[in-house]
Swiss-Prot record:
Domains (record comment): The N-terminus domain (NTD) plays a critical role in DNA-binding, catalytic complex assembly and catalysis.
UniProt protein name: DNA ligase
Keywords tagged on the record: ATP-binding, Cell cycle, Cell division, DNA damage, DNA recombination, DNA repair, DNA replication, Ligase, Metal-binding, Nucleotide-binding, Virion
Site positions per UniProt: Important for the catalytic efficiency: N153, L211, L402, Q403
Record-annotated active site: K151
Length: 419
């Protein structure tokens, strides 16, 4: 239970993270709220057992510390907690548990005041997946097993509470969702019981509904929505290095604070010891109607997707789709080693074009092909041919295949013999 509260113990005293502000003179001020457990004038070590069973003759004390840069530390009078609440009921608390809940409430209230009614946190882009249908071996070389959960084919969303107490719900591209009041209402209730600084990362989703329908619901400005918010991660802007397994523990504790939510859910996690176990879970998730699976490096930090950065601590597993498309042109890559390497250009029935990477050609072959293939040779031997393309999914906005790779031509063609 101790791990559900932000902060840490030092010399048997638990201190919440400092809440910092600036004085009128421009100096940094810090406010810290602490909890200690006393028994006959002795400070006891705080244990998880104290959250379920009272210690004889023990009382909990709450106090605050305040200091300004280069100034002395001022310590408040202690507030003593001598008994829990709701005794005899299912939601009864012990002395220690009640003291921590009281301290968290004061901590959150102070944090809101110091942020100010008009001070809003910036949007932090969510962490993006780097690996597709590949699980790095390093994931299994850590002390803690990788984490796997079902991949829902929904709309990515991040939630946080603003300085005025309102809920900000925004997309992967940092666009605010203006509707979804059903979800925001429950988020506001949840934030009454948890650290107000935490960001919740997940997907807007309704099971077995197509992505296009979900996207339409997510972007609607209407107050009502059928969508649910499935949360699979959490993070703090000043603690991005916190490992994934620790974040998952905190996320579980967050959802324990309010268990009567209807539209917000924690995504279930599974630990795996090898790739075969991860692949079996992926197969099971697909049978249940999900898109596939996400694999997380248990010790990986939270790496925001600034500038479309894709984190090497995430992998996505999902079945590939394939179809035939008409080849109409060719081009080259735009940067790095892809510059000068041939790419195929295919066309959809609606005349929209998209680029396809040859899957079975080496870079040396792709360089040679782009250098030697002329428009005349292309028109004579390749234009209008059906190209088999495997891809992850169709874009809900354009219908274009995403992560498209050319497997080969429907009729046997050796493109290297053309040049």
């Amino acid at each position: 239970m101790l791990s559900q509260f932000p902060g840490q113990c030092s010399n048997n005293v638990f201190c919440f993270p400092p809440i910092e502000s600036e004085t009128k003179n421009g100096k940094k001020a810090s406010w810290i709220i602490c909890v200690q457990v006393m028994q006959h004038n002795t400070i006891l070590p705080i244990t998880d057992e104290m959250f379920s069973t009272d210690v004889k003759d023990a009382v909990a004390e709450i106090f605050t510390k305040f200091f300004v840069e280069e100034g002395a530390v001022r310590i408040s009078k202690t507030t003593r907690v001598t008994e829990g609440k709701n005794l005899g009921k299912k939601n009864a608390t012990t002395v220690v548990h009640q003291a921590f809940k009281d301290a968290l409430s004061k901590y959150n209230r102070h944090a809101r005041q110091k942020r100010g009614a008009h001070t809003n946190r910036g949007m932090i882009p969510p962490m993006l997946v780097k690996y597709f249908n590949i699980i790095p071996k390093t994931f299994f070389e850590e002390e803690t097993d990788p984490i796997v959960h079902g991949k829902r084919n929904g709309v990515r969303a991040v939630a946080c509470q603003q300085g005025d107490g309102s809920i900000l719900l925004y997309s992967r591209t940092e666009k605010e969702f203006l509707g979804l009041d059903n979800i925001k209402k429950e988020l506001k209730q949840l934030y009454l019981f948890i650290d107000v600084r935490v960001y919740l990362d997940g997907e807007l989703y309704l099971h077995r509904k197509p992505l296009q329908w979900i996207a339409g619901q997510a972007n609607a400005k209407a107050d009502s929505s059928e969508l649910h918010f499935y949360v699979f991660d959490c993070f703090w802007s000043d603690q991005l290095q916190m490992p994934s397994n620790k974040r998952q523990q905190l996320l579980t504790n967050i959802f324990k604070q309010k268990e009567d939510l209807t539209f917000i859910h924690q995504v279930e996690n599974f630990s795996v010891k090898n790739e075969d176990e991860a692949l079996r879970l992926k197969t099971q998730f697909i049978k249940e109607g999900y898109e596939g699976a996400i694999v997380r490096n248990a010790n990986g930090p939270y790496e925001p997707g600034y500038n479309n950065y894709h984190s090497p601590h995430l992998a996505k597993l999902k079945p590939l789709l394939d179809a035939e498309f008409i080849l109409v042109d060719y081009t080259q890559g735009k940067k790095g080693k892809d510059l000068g390497a041939i790419l195929w250009v295919c066309e959809l029935p609606n005349k929209k074009r998209f680029v396809v990477t040859p899957k079975h050609l080496t870079y040396a072959d792709r360089y040679a092909l782009f250098q030697k293939l002329t428009p005349a040779l292309f028109k004579k031997h390749l234009y209008g041919k059906e190209l088999t393309v495997e891809y992850a999914e169709l874009s809900p906005k354009t219908g274009i295949p995403l992560q498209a790779r050319a497997v080969g031509f429907r009729e046997p063609i050796n493109v290297l013999e053309i040049i």
